[in-house]
Amino acid sequence: MSRISDAFQKRKSLIAYITVGYPDIETTLRLVPLLEENGVDIIELGIPFSDPLADGVTIQNASYQALQNGVTPEVCLSVAALLKEKISIPMVFMGYYNPIYNYGLTKFCQKCATAGVSGFIIPDLPPGEAQDIDFAATEAGLDIIFLLAPTSTDERIKLVAAKSRGFIYLVSHSGVTGATANLPADLSSFVNRVRKTARQPLAVGFGISTPEQAQNIAKFSDGIIVGSRILQLVQTDPSLEKVATFIRQLRQSLD
């Protein structure tokens, strides 16, 4: 069992996404330990990219600012290495394929392992086209986590169930990331459809912004993923007190 899948064994997993270097590296290094202290089980470190197709305005803006700050995959690896000394929860990179491919798949995976990263999510890489990076990840002892959406076919679900390690990322709705007031009424049926095939833990993301939503989704999933709301709170409150309060509320809603 990997460190990532192990994070689902004792309780509903709370997974937090942040963009590395937003609004600056110093904040990232303060924010991640704070997230762990207040109940996060897995941290997703977003690698900024100039064309984040799966992301809504909040993460797009965070990615743009991080790029303006000079954040590259190399910088993200350095930040992860620093965080490894500060936290005990698993770290997962989330990033688009192009920067990782350009960096070098084998080198990237090896450096991830050295930096203490346990796996990664590449939202624009279908599992049927992931053989090269899957091989490099396996050699480095990393999990590669694939996504499914409500529109996914039974064939795609079977493929992801065969390929994904650590957990499966279930997208709550078609479209892009971003906090939303209403999540699909048939979300539970989607999760249950995947569960008939998959053995991995199932975590739901895209649109979760309140403890009430988290509590409802946790009734039929193994974990929840929150990102845009965290970045919004970071933007409005540099002290990070609002983020800490929000994460504690999410943790309480899941326990």
UniProtKB/Swiss-Prot annotation:
As recorded in UniProt, its EC number(s) are 4.2.1.20
InterPro entries this protein is in?
Aldolase_TIM (IPR013785), RibuloseP-bd_barrel (IPR011060), Trp_synthase_alpha_AS (IPR018204), Trp_synthase_suA (IPR002028)
Q: Which reaction does this enzyme catalyse, per its entry?
A: (1S,2R)-1-C-(indol-3-yl)glycerol 3-phosphate + L-serine = D-glyceraldehyde 3-phosphate + L-tryptophan + H2O
Q: Which Pfam families match?
A: Trp_syntA (PF00290)
Instruction: Tell me the pathway.
Output: Amino-acid biosynthesis; L-tryptophan biosynthesis; L-tryptophan from chorismate: step 5/5
What GO molecular function annotation could you give as one example from this UniProt entry?
Answer: tryptophan synthase activity
Q: Which residues form the active site?
A: 44, 55
Q: What class of enzyme is it?
A: lyase
Gene Ontology cellular component? cytosol
Q: Which UniProt keywords apply?
A: Amino-acid biosynthesis, Aromatic amino acid biosynthesis, Lyase, Tryptophan biosynthesis
PROSITE patterns according to UniProt: TRP_SYNTHASE_ALPHA
What does the UniProt function comment say about this protein?
The alpha subunit is responsible for the aldol cleavage of indoleglycerol phosphate to indole and glyceraldehyde 3-phosphate.
The record's family statement is: Belongs to the TrpA family.
- Report quaternary structure and partners: Tetramer of two alpha and two beta chains.
Name the UniProt record assigns to this protein? Tryptophan synthase alpha chain
